[in-house]
Structures are given as structure tokens and as C-alpha cells.
Amino acid sequence: MPEPLLLIHGLGASGTVWDPVLPLLEGEREVVVLDMPGFGTASPLPDGVEPTAANLGAALHAACVDRGIERPHVAGNSLGGWVGLEMGRAGWAASVTAISPAGLWRAPLGQRPGRDARALGRRLRPLVAAATLVPPVRRRMLSTFAAHPERIPAAAGRELVLGWIDANGYDGANRAMRTHIFEPDGYPEEVPVTIAWGEHDHLVGPPKPARRPAGTRFLVLPDVGHTPMWDDPGLVARTLLEGSAIPAAL
């Protein structure tokens, strides 16, 4: 029976960002796709629980246990990559593959000053569906996500933008993401870690060696952006399969 592989999306997205790679994983892994608390169809964390990467990971671990899965391989993109790394630290992941993970910067980002882009997005929400049907407009809207936004279908692009606008867990998770950093020191050596960075990722730069867990396998994914599942589904699928095939240390 294939080994379980949990896929975790990034900030403002939902599990559907993995749709392009799912057919390529079929039969190779028992794929589990969950929305993080406060995103997609998932309820936010309880009041008073800060939506840090570690706490989001704890919620996803509990959801996996409810499905009879104790320790899946875990792969995540952006904030989801950081969540996956925290699941590995806690002993809840057989391996971790993090694609352009957040949190590996050297110091907390702090809150971004200036205009609230999501507030503007909410005002423009009625126009999103029509805008994503116009290829040049769709490419402009989605250029943050992908190196080749023209490869993102209109329906998927609309879902990406509306998910970012509507996610009730966005503000809290974004605030926590900008307040904390990932700490690589003391990371369990028995958890294989792969960090893959998109060559054309303009949101998150490649982490310095000192910011990665010891023994991390680091890859540069050519000709893809921050959320590369539409840029090159085959490359992403191979990266996930290879990362989840590395045997854990005994």
C-alpha cells in the first residue's frame, strides 16, 4: 500500500493548489490534502490560539490522526512548508519536503506598513470573476504566484484570488508568520528534509545554509515561481516523490 503524503498549501490559498500534481502522484502515494485552519473550507483555530506554524501543524496532525494516519510524509508550499517543518520537529512527519518555505529568514519580518491590499481586494471582489477570464489581466493578477501565470486556468486563478480575499484565517496567520521565525537548531536528525526553491520565486528568497536544518537536501527548481504547481506539475511531483522516498535515519 502506498505511504501517506500530506500536502499543505500556503498563506491565503487552499488545498486545491495541489490539483495539477495529484494525477501524477496517484498510485505512488496515499495523498492527503487538507485545508489549514482558517483557509478554504476549514474553520479557524479556537480563540486564543495563535495561528503559528507550529499550532497550524498541530491541528493538521490531529486531523491526520482522526483519519488513522499517525506520521505521514509531509510536503508544503510557502507557509505550508514552514508548517511541515514544524510537524517534522514535533515527530509528526516521516519526511518533510518544503517548497519555497516561509519562516527561514534571518529575523522576523515585522508587519508590512502601508495600504491593506486585501481591503482593496475586497472592494474589487465583484470584478474578480470577469477579470480572470481576460488572459492579459489574469497573467498580471497571478504573476506573484507563478513564473508562467498563463498556465493557470481561469477557474483556478479565480479561486486563488478569492481565497486570498476571503480567508478568515489570513490576518492572524500572516501576523504570526511575520512575528516569528523558524529555528533550525536542534532539528531531529532522523527526519529527512528537502527544501526546494523556485528559481523565479520573487516572494521568498533561497534560505541561507545556516537557516536550514542540518543535513537538509537543497534544490533549485528551474523556471518556476513561488507556487510552482501550475508552472511545472511534473517537476513538482518528482520533487515530492523523491523527498518522501528518502529513508528516515534509524
Residues covered by each model-derived region:
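Conserved HGGG/HGGXW glycine-rich cap/lid loop of the alpha/beta-hydrolase fold
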Residues: 1-44
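Conserved loop-alpha-helix segment in the C-terminal half of the alpha/beta-hydrolase fold
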Residues: 23, 192-224, 230
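Flexible "cap/lid" loop of the alpha/beta hydrolase fold
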Residues: 89-127
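Conserved alpha/beta-hydrolase "nucleophile elbow" surrounding the catalytic nucleophile
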Residues: 9-11, 72, 76-81, 198
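Catalytic active-site module of serine/aspartate enzymes centered on a nucleophile-bearing elbow/loop
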Residues: 214-250
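Conserved alpha/beta-hydrolase catalytic His-Asp/Glu region
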Residues: 98, 130-188
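Hydrolases whose catalytic domains are alpha/beta-hydrolase-1, hotdog thioesterase
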Residues: 83-87
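Active-site loop/oxyanion-hole signature of alpha/beta-hydrolase fold enzymes
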Residues: 20, 32-75, 79, 237-238
